[in-house]
């Protein structure tokens, strides 16, 4: 049976071209009609194929979707929904880009001259003050660092009893409370708040300090913290920070209006070494009572080389303050200027990835006008001041020999570190302190010595 479409086309062609049909032979006409029929059949086949594709596509997910089974596709969709909900919740709670870390270092200290030995942890700095045998030893800290979408950083570190704010006399748990705000780009920032001092090669945190104790320059010649505002600039390998701030004071007392300028410049020469320098210039409180704030100038240069198993670090410092010497002029009684200079060097070598030995040597020259360091007067526990001969029987005040010359100090520390795991380090240190004057008090019998011995141990745990 012939196709009705074929018959209709035959009649149409015959009607439209009667003269051509008569001129052509029957055989030629049949060839043309067969060709036309084949073409029509091809069009019909293509139409059927196009109608069958949507049905096949609709049935495909029942068997597979993107190379997954239906169950796998359902699990994937469920995970995607939960992930989006978790991201929304994290952002709503303020936890996005929030880093929480912390550390603690329960310690044991033996001090020969103080006739003291025992564990040391979270002792209040108000009970006995700041000394080289307690400083930031036996602390705990919680660190919160939050960065917003725009690049602003909010930094809060809490450390009870022995934080920087407690050391400067406020008694709070604040160690750092600062903000860093980008100005135009992330390499130019405004910094403000309460910031620990950044001078020297040694860091405040026990996680970044190889020994249990700190060097002489860290303890006696550097500021504790700044409260103020300034800029931080990053330009290639250079990082510069400068602030206009109160030094060691969260608020200026009545009658004081002059802040200090504090700055720090670091240069990373390469992967293994670098150097930096820091300074403080301006009026600050001194260790002589009743003088108020006087002009202070501090400057130090430090550097490091860390490659393979070796670590080398060093620092040279100079400082001086007006009317801050321990002893006044013997003739006029007028207060005189204090001045000091010193250096510290540290070398460490790892015999294995876990086992490290450390040696540190410090020297501090402080002989001018009976001595006097940053915030320190005569101190028989720290070994600062002129020759000490005893104490007054009635008042207990120190008695001095030659008051014109203060003691120069040295300290040698030898230590061992053992990295128990990625978060735990055991430290052991022996330290020998010496002075060229009798400035260390032996509390057992009340005599004075030129030297002291200290043994310290701690376990530093961080997360």
Indicate residue ranges for each PLM-predicted region.
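Outer-membrane beta-barrel pore domains
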Residues: 126-129, 166-167, 273-463
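A general secondary-structure boundary signal
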Residues: 24-25, 32-36, 40-54, 83-84, ...
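Short, small-residue-enriched loops and turns at beta-alpha junctions
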Residues: 249-251, 284-285
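Gram-negative bacterial Sec-dependent N-terminal signal peptides
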Residues: 1-22
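Generic alpha-helical hydrophobic packing signal
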Residues: 28-32, 44, 151-152, 186-189, ...
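Outer membrane beta-barrel
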Residues: 86-249, 255-262, 266-275, 343-369
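Acidic-residue sensor for enzyme active/binding pockets
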Residues: 28, 32, 44, 51, ...
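N-terminal periplasmic/intermembrane-space "pro-region" immediately following the signal or transit peptide
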Residues: 13, 22-119, 391-393, 397-398, ...
């Amino acid at each position: 049976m012939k196709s009705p479409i074929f018959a209709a086309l035959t009649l149409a062609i015959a009607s439209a071209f009667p003269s051509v049909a008569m001129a052509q032979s029957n055989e030629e006409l049949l060839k043309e009609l067969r060709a036309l029929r084949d073409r029509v059949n091809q069009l019909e086949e293509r139409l059927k194929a196009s109608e069958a594709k949507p049905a096949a596509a609709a049935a495909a997910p029942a068997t597979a979707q993107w190379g997954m089974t239906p169950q796998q596709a359902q699990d994937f969709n469920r995970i995607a929904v939960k992930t989006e909900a978790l991201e929304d919740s994290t952002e709503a709670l303020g936890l996005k880009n929030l880093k929480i870390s912390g550390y603690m270092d329960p310690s044991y200290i033996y001090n020969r001259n103080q006739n003291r030995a025992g564990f040391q942890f979270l002792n209040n700095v108000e009970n006995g003050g700041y000394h080289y045998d307690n400083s930031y030893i036996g602390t705990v800290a919680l660190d919160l660092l939050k960065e917003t979408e725009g690049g602003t950083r909010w930094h809060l570190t809490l450390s009870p009893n022995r934080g920087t704010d407690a050391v400067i006399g406020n008694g709070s748990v604040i160690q750092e409370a600062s903000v860093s705000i980008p100005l135009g780009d992330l390499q130019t920032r405004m910094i403000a708040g309460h910031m620990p001092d950044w001078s020297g090669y040694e860091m405040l945190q026990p996680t970044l300090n190889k020994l249990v104790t700190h060097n002489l320059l860290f303890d006696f010649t550097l500021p504790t913290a700044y409260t103020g505002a300034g800029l931080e600039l990053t330009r290639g390998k250079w990082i510069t920070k400068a602030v206009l701030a109160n030094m060691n004071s969260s608020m200026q007392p009545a009658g004081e209006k002059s802040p200090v300028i504090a700055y720090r410049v670091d240069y990373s020469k390469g992967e293994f070494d670098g150097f930096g320098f820091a300074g403080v210039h301006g009026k600050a409180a001194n260790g002589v009572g009743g003088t108020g704030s006087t002009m202070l100038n501090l400057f130090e240069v430090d550097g490091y080389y860390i490659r393979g198993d070796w670590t080398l670090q060093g620092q040279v410092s100079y400082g001086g303050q007006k009317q801050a010497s321990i002893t006044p002029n013997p003739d006029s009684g007028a207060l005189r200027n204090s001045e000091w200079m010193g250096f510290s060097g540290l070398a460490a070598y790892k015999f294995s990835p876990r086992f490290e030995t450390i040696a540190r040597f410090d020297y501090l020259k402080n002989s001018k006008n009976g001595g006097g360091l940053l915030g320190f007067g005569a101190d028989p526990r720290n070994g600062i001041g002129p020759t000490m001969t005893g104490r007054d029987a009635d008042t207990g005040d120190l008695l001095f020999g030659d008051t014109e010359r203060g003691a120069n100090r040295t300290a040698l520390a030898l230590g061992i570190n053992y990295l128990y795991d990625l978060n735990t380090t055991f430290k052991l240190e022996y330290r020998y302190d010496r002075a060229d004057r009798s400035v260390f008090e032996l509390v057992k019998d009340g005599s004075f010595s030129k030297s002291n011995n200290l043994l310290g141990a701690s376990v530093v745990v961080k997360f």
